[in-house]
Regions:
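Amphipathic alpha-helical assembly/interaction segments
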Residues: 1-123
Length: 123
């Protein structure tokens, strides 16, 4: 999913959206290994939080006003914070390795920095 030119014509061209999709894939792969009793609990919540990140970026991109776009980027940031907390919980419950936790948190940190920078550009 790499851009072929420097032009951004839709949300798929945004690096922040692409990284968000990577977070979704990593979250789904990670939660596959969770205990069965978490299917409708932590696994489901983590997946919803992860999916919310690129979804809100895409929705915001297609809004007509920068204020609306920025609002949805803030929602995506909130979803990042939710997922960060859920990763901590999953780690405390020994549902993931320290390496997996570290990798996910590093990607989330990068995503949050990119989202904050995009909000600054819109304001």
């Amino acid at each position: 999913m790499q851009r072929t030119s420097g032009k951004i014509t839709n949300f798929r061209d945004l690096d922040v959206w692409q990284k968000g999709i990577d977070i979704v894939k990593d979250t789904y792969r990670t939660t596959r290994g969770f205990p069965r009793q978490e299917v409708f609990g932590l696994s489901s919540q983590m997946r919803r939080s992860a999916v919310s990140i690129p979804s809100n970026i895409a929705e915001g991109f297609n809004r007509f006003h920068n204020k609306e776009y920025a609002h949805l980027l803030y929602v995506a940031l909130g979803s990042c914070a939710e997922l960060e907390t859920q990763i901590e919980i999953a780690s405390e419950l020994a549902y993931m390795s320290a390496e997996t936790k570290s990798s996910l948190l590093e990607k989330l940190d990068h995503e949050m920095r990119m989202l904050r920078n995009l909000v600054k550009k819109l304001n």
